[in-house]
Amino acid sequence: MSSEPGRVMALDVGERRIGVALSDPTRMLASPLTTIRAVPRSTALKRILTLIRDYQVTALVVGLPLTMNGDIGPQATLVQQFVDELRPLIDIPIFFVDERLTTVAAERMMIDLKIKPEQRRARIDEVAASIILQDFLDSQR
């Protein structure tokens, strides 16, 4: 990743929802930001573009859900198709990160924090995105 200062955004793209996380300006800490509806696709893309602009994002990290043996399966293909639609609309670097088991880790974290089940369902995607982003930020140090 470039040494250009600024926030990094992460996306956890699913069929129905997209979790969004954002780093602090120093790129040390990732935090859940929001969850947006993945459909209609045009609305989701507009919302992501607005967030990128509003938070002055300088890089994008996208979780790629590889299969357990590291292959690209149907879910990863869905994510790649989404990024193919997003890429021409933005002028910042995009990084794919292996996101196997991040949703499981997010669920466990929220259970440990005693977050109620209905709140967990509402925030699972953005928490997973923050785990993806924090792993990426840590790997860049």
From Swiss-Prot:
GO terms for cellular component: cytosol. GO terms for molecular function: nuclease activity. It comes from the Bacteria. Signal peptide: none annotated. The keyword Nucleotide-binding does not apply. Keywords: Cytoplasm, Hydrolase, Nuclease, Ribosome biogenesis. Its EC number is 3.1.-.-. It is an enzyme of class 3 (hydrolase). Belongs to the YqgF nuclease family. This is Putative pre-16S rRNA nuclease.
